[in-house]
Amino acid sequence: MSDAFPEMTVGAGTVLTTDQAQKAVWCGAQFIVSPGLNPKVVSWCIDRNIPVIPGIATPTELEAALDLGLTTVKFFPAEAFGGLKTLKAISAPYGNVRFMPTGGIHPENLNNYLSFLKIFACGGSWMVP
C-alpha cells in the first residue's frame, strides 16, 4: 500500500507480537498500533525508530507506557471503560500525554472525543465498512 500511495502514511493495527511488528514494517507500515501494552513490541519499535501507539485502559498501564518513554497511547476499549469521562479522569495528572481512543467510537460520539485537547485522533471500524 505504501508503494502504491507514497503520500499516505500507512500503519498497522492490532499488532500483538514483535514478529507481527517486523512483518508489518517489512510490508511498509510506518507506525504500529496495539490493543495493549506489550513491552517487547514497544521496545522493538523504539529500537528501530518506528512510532508505536500501544493500548492502555488504566493509570497503571499508562505509567508503564511512560516508563518505556512513550507519551502517545491508545485508550482502548474506550466506551467499555467509561468513555470520555474516564479518559478525562485518567489523563488529568498526565499533562504531556496524548491519546487515541478506539473501541465504541462512532459518528455520534466522535466530535465529543475530538473536542478534548489531549486527543490527537480517534479510531473506529465504522470508518471502513
Question: Locations of the language-model features?
Answer:
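Catalytic cores of alpha/beta
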Residues: 17-27, 60-68, 85, 91-92, ...
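Short, glycine/charged-rich beta-strand-loop motifs at protein surfaces that mediate ligand recognition
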Residues: 76-77, 97-104, 109
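Glycine-enriched alpha-helix->loop->beta-strand junction motifs that scaffold or abut catalytic
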Residues: 4-8, 26-32, 47-53, 67-72, ...
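Glycine-rich phosphate-binding active-site loops on the catalytic face of alpha/beta enzymes
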Residues: 31, 35-41, 74-84, 118-129
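Catalytic beta/alpha-barrel core
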Residues: 8-16, 29-37, 51-58, 62, ...
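Glycine-rich beta-strand-to-loop/alpha-helix junction loops that act as flexible
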Residues: 12-13, 101-105, 122-126
